[in-house]
Design a protein with these regions (language model features):
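ATP-dependent carboxylate activation and anion-phosphoryl transfer catalytic cores
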Residues: 1-216
Length: 216
């Protein structure tokens, strides 16, 4: 499976499940005496049971959605803890505000099995209102075939899930990339699709809605 859109808080996850996952993640880190930034991944079954997948000893691509709903700079936290400082806040001191969504802008062709598309960015225009854009690419830069083809992360925050989704859609419409094939239109189709808007999600989304991969 491929990560396409990330969001926080996770839709369909109860507060009880969220607390249980958090406690399990803490126990996993404590069991090996781990100190530092880390990301524990779980897979949620339809019956509400969850299963450990993996732990990455770092922040992950999707950390901005957590930053936007908590108002915290996790990169700064990571560096402070690595320098021997305690965590700035305890778990019960971390605020949760609204919802956030992130898409990964890739130089790839979704209709051809997400085949990477190397080339030179002849135009790269990123949105500036109501979204956050994390990127290291500018016009004239080359997307190499030797590395991951992600060119940017576009993230939106809103008072609720639908507002965040709509802001992200607006941001995608304002983005312009030329010189490479990209997944922006595909991302917009997914965000605007009925199952995604209704948060009717599982790992079979594209399998059940293959039309989202098709170019209109």
């Amino acid at each position: 499976h491929q990560k396409i859109i990330e969001e926080a808080p996770a839709p369909g996850l109860s507060d009880e499940q969220r607390r249980a996952m958090g406690a399990a993640a803490v126990r996993a880190a404590e069991a090996i005496g781990y100190e530092g930034a880390g990301t524990v991944e779980f897979l949620l079954a339809p019956d509400g049971e969850f299963f450990f997948m993996e732990m990455n000893t770092r922040l992950q691509v999707e950390h901005p959605v957590t930053e936007l709903i908590t108002g915290q700079d996790l990169v700064a936290w990571q560096l402070q803890v690595a320098d021997g400082a305690p965590l700035p806040l305890a778990q019960n001191e971390i605020p949760l505000n609204g919802a956030a969504m992130e898409v990964r802008a890739y130089a790839e062709d979704p209709a051809r099995g997400f085949l990477p598309s190397a080339g030179t960015l002849t135009r790269a225009h990123w949105p500036r209102e109501n979204v956050r854009v994390d990127t290291g690419f500018e016009e004239g830069d080359t997307v190499s075939d030797h590395y991951d083809p992600m060119v940017a992360k576009i993230i939106a925050h809103g008072s609720d899930r639908d507002r965040a989704r709509r802001r992200l859609c607006q941001g995608l419409r304002q983005t312009r990339l030329t010189g490479i094939r990209h997944n922006l239109d595909f991302l917009l189709r997914v965000l605007e699709s009925e199952p995604f808007a209704a948060a009717e999600l599982d790992t079979r989304l594209l399998e059940l809605h293959a039309e989202l991969l098709e170019v209109p």
